[in-house]
Amino acid sequence: LVVLATTVVSFRSNRASDGRKIAVNKRRRELVVPPGKLRECCGRVGPMCPKCMCPPRRC
C-alpha cells in the first residue's frame, strides 16, 4: 500500500511537470519569429516594431 501511494504521487508530479514543459515550449515557439517578420525601427529590431516615430534625421 505504501509503495502504491508513492507511485500515484510521483505520477501526479510528473504530469504537472509535463504541463509546465508544454507551456514553456509553447512560449518559446511564440518568441521565435521568422526573419521576414522582423522590422528595424530607430536602431531596434523586433517582431512588433511600430512605424518609426523618430525625427527624420534618425530614421
Swiss-Prot record:
The keyword Disulfide bond applies. This is Conotoxin Bu26. The lineage of its organism: Eukaryota, Metazoa, Spiralia, Lophotrochozoa, Mollusca. Residues 11-37 form a propeptide. It is found in: Secreted. It holds the Pfam family Toxin_8. Keywords: Disulfide bond, Ion channel impairing toxin, Neurotoxin, Secreted, Signal, Toxin. Coiled coil: none annotated. Expressed by the venom duct. Contains 3 disulfide bonds. They are not indicated here, since framework IV presents two different connectivities (I-V, II-III, IV-VI and I-III, II-V, IV-VI). Residues 1-10 form the signal peptide. GO terms for molecular function: acetylcholine receptor inhibitor activity; ion channel regulator activity; toxin activity. The keyword Secreted applies.
